[in-house]
Amino acid sequence: MGDLFSLFWEVDPPPIPLNCAIPNQDYECRKDDSCGTIGNFLLWYFVIVFVLMFFSRASVWMSEDKKDEGSGTSTSVRKASKETSYKWQSKDGAWDPSQTMKKPKQNQLTPVTNSEVALVNAYLEQRRARRQSQFNEVNQNQHDSDTTECGSEESNSEASSWKESESEHHPSPDSIKRRKMAQRQRNLGSYQMSERHCLHCKAMRTNEWLVHHSQQKASVTPPMKGDSPEESSISDINTKFSKF
């Protein structure tokens, strides 16, 4: 243990008497090889720690280099854009530093304003579509109400015409009585006319027969004195029939 501590700290060895012989340290180290193993372990330990630190630092350096390259490209792009803007301004006219200071802000706000304009346009289109749909619904409701009114009027007219036709097909009892009375009167008149015609024809025929028969008798037999009442009766009959 004394040898191990002597590697890290300097320990004053105890005084050696003059009579004692000094042992050989190389022989003891060869006999007990713990010094070499500890030294090798410490050596490899420091080597491994150094390698790990190197790799960690190398990764950090690489990431920083990439960031620097990206920032360099962005700065180069910015410089190029500025140069182009300067060129355009120099072509257009005099250069104004206030305009160059304001332009980056305007460039940053342009996409926001464009999106806002798009949103406002979309909102207005939605409102227009809603109003158009409401207007169409109102027109449709008015058209439906007009059609229902027309349909109700047509149905009422049809119902009234149907009632009139029913009243015509199904007359009232008063009209039936009137029709029967008129028909009876017509029948009586036609019967009376037919009877009158028949009596007149009979009278004419009898008159003709009597006249013809009397002429035949007159031609066959001359008239006698005693026959005067018969002739007078025949003449009376003829006069009566002629009057009738």
UniProtKB/Swiss-Prot annotation:
Bias (Polar residues): 97-112, 132-142, 231-244
Ranges of compositional bias, category Basic and acidic residues: 80-94, 161-176
InterPro entries according to UniProt: DUF4636
Transmembrane regions listed in the UniProt entry: 35-55
Topology in membrane: Single-pass membrane protein
Keywords carried by this UniProt record: Membrane, Transmembrane, Transmembrane helix
GO cellular component: membrane
Chain segments carrying region Disordered: 65-112, 132-191, 213-244
Compartments in which it is found: Membrane
One protein family per Pfam: DUF4636
Top-level taxonomic group: Eukaryota
Major localisation: membrane
Name the UniProt record assigns to this protein: Serine-rich single-pass membrane protein 1
Organism: Macaca fascicularis (Crab-eating macaque)
Taxonomic path: Eukaryota, Metazoa, Chordata, Craniata, Vertebrata
